[in-house]
């Protein structure tokens, strides 16, 4: 049962990025933890680390985070009690901000359309590889999350920068970037050149409407055509938008951590590459088959193809009329 008292959660959440709770160091993954094979390139996502720093530095953000999780828990409980009526699919308008130095970084309109199509398939549960969801997890799959994406605009800007960091410089025109378009009402995605080992990162819903709110993705991992293997199926955007809609990494960013979702099996840490099912690890003395094919793990694009029903509920709570990202709703 993945549920923590909020005060305990906040203390854990604001701890150092690599603390991993000393009491959990005895938990075992043994030889069953999936690691990269055939490629040294691993998925790297800085969203949780950036969030921790932001929460440490801003009492206002901590308050918004507290309110966000309280509303999410209420939405989940109300849904169980039949108090939430279906209000249909939410369509989110997207602005893609392209910062390019080379022609390959100036991604084409067709590649942007391709990425939007991947998001709509993955969040609509119509992705062709959903057929690969193991029988044991079929009853837990989200299916249609009832969130769709529509390209509203593309903004392009030439730059001389050869690399970008996670300091949000790409989000300010004053630092050579592109200012966000109405971040309360649009999902802004910045596509930039090299970010080193980071494929992308995102802000969480407590940052809704702030100047830096949105998703950043390295051009090499945006879309499909021309993207770099093994992250060339558009799933970096699927993963990062999951953070934007309040999903944590499936391992809870700690050894046997908590992702605040009850139907995702607890796991010792991230999985990489293309694991073979079933993949087991042990947490709390219990051996479990892990949901490594979840979009919020670190496996290669070809190995991830599902959200869980619990994750769907968390995302729906954020875009609901009372949610932190209600401003994104299009009717």
Tell where the protein language model's regions lie, with residue ranges.
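C-terminal motif of bacterial Sec signal peptides marking the signal peptidase cleavage site
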Residues: 13-16
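Bacterial signal peptide processing site
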Residues: 18-21
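Propeptide-to-catalytic entry region of secreted or membrane-anchored zinc metalloproteases
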Residues: 27-183, 320, 325, 331
């Amino acid at each position: 049962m993945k549920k923590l008292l909020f005060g305990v959660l906040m203390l854990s959440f604001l701890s150092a990025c690599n603390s991993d709770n000393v009491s959990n160091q005895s938990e075992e993954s043994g030889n069953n933890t999936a690691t990269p094979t055939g490629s040294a390139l691993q998925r790297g996502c800085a969203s949780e680390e950036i969030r921790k720093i932001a929460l440490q530095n801003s009492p206002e953000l901590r308050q918004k985070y507290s309110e966000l999780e309280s509303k999410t828990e209420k939405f989940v409980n109300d849904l169980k009690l039949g108090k939430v009526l279906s209000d249909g699919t939410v369509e989110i308008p997207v602005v893609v901000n392209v910062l390019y130095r080379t022609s390959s970084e100036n991604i084409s309109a067709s590649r942007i359309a391709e990425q939007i199509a991947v998001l709509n398939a993955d969040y609509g549960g119509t992705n062709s590889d959903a057929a690969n969801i193991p029988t044991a997890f079929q009853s837990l799959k989200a299916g249609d999350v009832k969130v769709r994406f529509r390209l509203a605009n593309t903004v392009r800007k030439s730059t001389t920068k050869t690399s970008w960091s996670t300091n949000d410089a790409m989000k300010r025109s004053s630092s050579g970037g592109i200012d966000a378009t109405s971040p309360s009402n649009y999902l802004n995605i910045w596509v930039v050149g090299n970010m080193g080992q980071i494929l992308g990162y995102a802000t969480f819903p407590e940052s809704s409407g702030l100047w830096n709110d949105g998703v950043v993705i390295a051009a090499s991992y945006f879309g499909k055509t021309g993207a770099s293997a093994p992250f060339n199926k558009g799933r970096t955007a699927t993963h990062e938008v999951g953070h934007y809609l309040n999903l944590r990494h499936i391992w809870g960013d700690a050894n046997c951590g908590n992702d605040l979702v009850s139907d995702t099996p607890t796991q010792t840490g991230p999985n990489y590459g293309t694991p073979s099912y079933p993949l087991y690890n042990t947490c709390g003395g219990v051996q479990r088959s892990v949901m490594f094919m979840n979009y919020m793990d670190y496996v290669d694009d070809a190995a991830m193809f599902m959200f869980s029903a619990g994750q769907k509920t968390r995302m729906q709570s954020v875009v609901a009329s009372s949610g932190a990202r209600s401003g994104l709703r299009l009717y």
